[in-house]
From Swiss-Prot:
The protein's name: Conotoxin Pu5.5
Compartments in which it is found: Secreted
Modifications the protein undergoes after translation, according to the UniProt entry: Contains 2 disulfide bonds that can be either 'C1-C3, C2-C4' or 'C1-C4, C2-C3', since these disulfide connectivities have been observed for conotoxins with cysteine framework V (for examples, see AC P0DQQ7 and AC P81755).
Highest taxon of source: Eukaryota
GO molecular function, one term: toxin activity
Length: 68
């Protein structure tokens, strides 16, 4: 009889724990780095598209990463 309250408490705790699907994605996401890289690349291309028609040196900066 002493184990019944402990067993009930454990059942309540297990039932209230978040499921695997409810947890946010962590660093273990294999594609996270790839997605971040693609977002940065697309943002660079969009920035260059706005800048390049007005200033050719700006294009060189966006495509090569320096003002050389």
């Amino acid at each position: 009889m002493r184990c019944v309250p402990v067993f009930i408490i454990l059942l309540v705790l297990i039932a209230s724990a978040p499921s695997v699907d409810a947890r946010p994605q962590t660093k273990d996401d294999a594609l996270a780095s790839f997605r971040d890289s693609i977002k940065r690349h697309l943002q660079t291309l969009l920035d260059a598209r706005e800048c390049c028609p007005q200033s050719p040196p700006c294009c060189h900066y966006y495509y090569y990463g320096s003002w050389k």
